[in-house]
Swiss-Prot record:
This is High osmolarity signaling protein SHO1. Residues 1-31, 84-93, 143-342 are cytoplasmic. Pfam families: SH3_1. Keywords: Cell membrane, Membrane, SH3 domain, Stress response, Transmembrane, Transmembrane helix. InterPro entries: SH3-like_dom_sf, SH3_domain, Sho1_SH3. SUPFAM superfamilies: SH3-domain. One of its GO terms (biological process) is regulation of actin filament polymerization. The keyword Cell membrane applies. GO terms for cellular component: plasma membrane.
Length: 342
């Protein structure tokens, strides 16, 4: 993935939901994708050309191999499209099953043609054998999680970096103790009081926490902070002298960014909570990055610097430097090296 400029970075924070567009750069920047697809195309051409010649000169050519060859090219086109739209991670389970079917087709065709006489049949069998080898490599890659050692090693050569692992993030989220507010409703007048009155729940059942931790700040929480105004007190309704409830209520549909101040947001980053919970991962800076002077939320770092990071689901990660400075960093400038290792 190309390094975003300032305008693109701001757009990413304003619109955190990914927009999948057709880009050949998504394919050509991934050496594994471009090399495996190229080899698969060469093998398919050999198998198809050999099959055409063999079928025209021999009645012993297995007829079911034609569907296997057509199925293989359709699958290759699908892989190409998914890579170009950057949707490969969403369809890995489907691809694993589809490749298993293709592997059965190509191996059966190879078994039928390998022992037939003639160079034409031999060329066709060589093509389907190569396709079988590529299919089993794809099954191993697409069937493994992105956090597996083999996939991390393969993705380390990609210009886009190591792909996000849903399994690894789920495990990290499940290890965070959820916060349950004491004597404060979700319509509390003061959101800050919810944070200070919250205590970790003694037991959390299920794979995900029952409630989101207040220490976890997603990339969507940064929307609108670039032009944040000075802190303003919430408007009070009614007469202060009366005993009526004069609190400002916030409903579930409130964005929360309209009255969130820059100081409150940075306070979430510098919260005195458990560091290992807020920043469970360790990342190494691949390049030197200088924060934008107009963006109070970006943090600078040097090449080779070790950073603690959290919220690794987006393009911008929450990070903490060794000197205690916290902020957000571009994910394509760093590489995950472990969890709680420094």
């Amino acid at each position: 993935m190309a390094v975003p400029n300032r305008v693109e970075a701001k757009q990413m924070r304003d619109h955190p939901h990914r927009i999948h567009e057709f880009r050949l750069a998504n394919l050509v920047t991934d050496p594994f994708a471009i090399s495996s697809l190229s080899l698969a195309l060469i093998a398919w051409i050999i198998a198809f050309a050999g099959s055409v010649v063999a079928a025209s000169n021999s009645k012993k050519y297995p007829a079911f191999s034609w569907w296997g060859i057509v199925y293989q090219i359709l699958l290759m086109v699908l892989v190409l499209i998914l890579y170009c739209y950057d949707l490969i991670d969403y369809y890995k389970s489907f691809l694993s099953g589809a490749l298993a079917v293709a592997f059965v087709y190509t191996t059966n065709s190879a078994a039928e043609m390998l022992y037939q006489d003639g160079s034409r049949m031999g060329a066709a069998s060589a093509g389907v054998i190569l396709l079988s080898m590529i299919n089993i490599i794809w099954m191993f890659y697409f069937g493994s999680d992105n956090a597996s050692p083999s996939n991390r090693w393969i993705d380390s050569y990609s210009l886009r970096g190591i792909r996000h692992s849903v399994l690894e993030s789920s495990i990290a989220m499940s290890s965070r103790p959820p916060l349950v507010s004491r004597n404060v409703s979700k319509y509390s007048a003061s959101p800050q009081m919810d944070l200070y009155n919250a205590t970790p729940a003694p037991h959390s059942q299920g794979f995900y926490p029952d409630t989101h931790s207040q220490h976890y700040v997603s990339s969507t929480a940064l929307n609108g902070f670039e032009n944040a105004g000075p802190p303003t007190a919430p408007a009070l309704h009614g007469n202060m002298g009366h005993g009526n409830n004069t609190s400002t209520f916030v409903t579930d549909t409130t964005n929360g960014n309209t009255e969130t101040t820059m100081g409150d947001t940075l306070g979430l980053y510098s919260d005195a909570g458990d560091e290992l919970t807020s920043f469970p991962y360790v990342a190494k800076a691949l390049y030197t990055y200088t924060a934008d002077s107009n963006d109070a939320y970006e943090v600078s770092f040097e090449q080779g610097e070790m950073l603690r990071v959290g919220d690794i689901e987006g393009r911008w990660w929450k990070a903490k430097r060794a000197n205690g400075e916290t902020g957000i960093i571009p994910s394509n400038y760093v590489e995950l090296v472990g969890e709680n290792s420094i």
